[in-house]
């Protein structure tokens, strides 16, 4: 399992809503266009496949950032919500 930060910039309101609705089924919205999703490799691949059906390469931008255990210890958060913790992880 990895914690993925997924960020997007989609100018079309309808596509942006579809993207957000899909991502809400996989993780937690932490900012307007940013989600944290704890996913297995197979779930991540499934999500990407579903996102590709919405994504328009000539207009949209999608970014996927996998966070390692070491990286998670370096995260600094100001405000809410708190960092999504992968199952079985300990953040020091």
UniProtKB/Swiss-Prot annotation:
Keyword Magnesium: yes
Pfam families, A to Z: CRISPR_Cas2 (PF09827)
Biological-process GO terms, alphabetical: defense response to virus; maintenance of CRISPR repeat elements
Subunit field text: Homodimer, forms a heterotetramer with a Cas1 homodimer.
CDD domains assigned to the protein according to its UniProt record, in alphabetical order: Cas2_I_II_III
SUPFAM superfamilies: TTP0101/SSO1404-like (SSF143430)
Cofactor field: Mg(2+)
Alphabetized GO MF terms: metal ion binding; RNA endonuclease activity
Entry protein name: CRISPR-associated endoribonuclease Cas2 3
Enzyme Commission numbers on file: 3.1.-.-
Key words, A-Z: Antiviral defense, Endonuclease, Hydrolase, Magnesium, Metal-binding, Nuclease, Plasmid
EC class name: hydrolase
Protein family per UniProt: Belongs to the CRISPR-associated endoribonuclease Cas2 protein family.
Annotated source species: Synechocystis sp. (strain ATCC 27184 / PCC 6803 / Kazusa)
Binding sites annotated in the UniProt record for Mg(2+): 9
Role: CRISPR (clustered regularly interspaced short palindromic repeat), is an adaptive immune system that provides protection against mobile genetic elements (viruses, transposable elements and conjugative plasmids). CRISPR clusters contain sequences complementary to antecedent mobile elements and target invading nucleic acids. CRISPR clusters are transcribed and processed into CRISPR RNA (crRNA). Functions as a ssRNA-specific endoribonuclease. Involved in the integration of spacer DNA into the CRISPR cassette.
Top-rank taxon, per record: Bacteria
